[in-house]
């Protein structure tokens, strides 16, 4: 418990007002940006989404988009063929079945092309303020380094353990803080361990401080 309190205090110190770094204006734009961010970076996603939503300003436009044209725009984020098809599929369902509004129901959202549990957690937490902890690569890495989860735990295992340890009213905020902490401090390569007050709890402190 002491470790968790120290982590929460440190995250509040580093990121008192954490913000999602994906650029969006509408609900479906956020959902699509999160889908595009899989196995990519927010920076790359932010380089293509303004182009997408400028060229295709409505869901109907995206639904009718030429797939090859959309693929070329999305190419920088990786897996561009698959992701272009996901975006067209999402636009089509939202336009045809939901009057252009992204549903808040988790099961319905997870039935959309390219939308899994992590994407739903990010979307619901960011857009609607629904308590959720989305476990992306940063959250998973930091959690395992700080022994909040076992090294062989699945993403779902990590999520469930964090939900038990973190107060529910902090879940969405905690997710954003952990993403930023993993992105800028507890990095996959060359983490900034020297001055980290959490290193006493870290599995990798010896390796990264030697």
PLM segments and residue spans:
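Catalytic cores of DNA base-excision repair glycosylases
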Residues: 3-210
């Amino acid at each position: 418990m002491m470790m968790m309190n120290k982590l929460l205090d440190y995250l509040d110190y580093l990121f008192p007002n954490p913000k999602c770094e994906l650029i969006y204006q509408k609900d479906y734009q956020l959902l699509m940006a999160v889908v595009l961010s899989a196995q990519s970076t927010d920076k790359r996603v932010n380089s293509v989404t303004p182009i997408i939503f400028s060229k295709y300003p409505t869901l109907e436009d995206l639904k009718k988009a030429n797939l090859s044209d959309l693929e070329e725009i999305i190419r920088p984020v990786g897996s561009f063929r698959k992701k272009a098809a996901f975006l067209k599929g999402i636009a089509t369902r939202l336009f045809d079945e939901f009057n252009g509004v992204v549903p808040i129901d988790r099961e319905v959202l997870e039935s959309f092309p390219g939308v899994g549990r992590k994407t739903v957690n990010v979307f619901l937490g960011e857009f609607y303020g629904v308590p959720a902890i989305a476990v992306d690569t940063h959250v998973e890495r930091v959690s395992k380094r700080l022994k909040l989860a076992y090294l062989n735990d699945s993403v779902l295992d990590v999520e469930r353990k964090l939900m038990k340890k973190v107060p529910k009213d902090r879940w969405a905020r905690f997710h954003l803080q952990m993403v930023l902490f993993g992105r800028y401090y507890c990095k996959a390569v060359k983490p900034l361990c020297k001055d980290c007050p959490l290193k006493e709890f870290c599995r990798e402190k010896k390796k990264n401080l030697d």
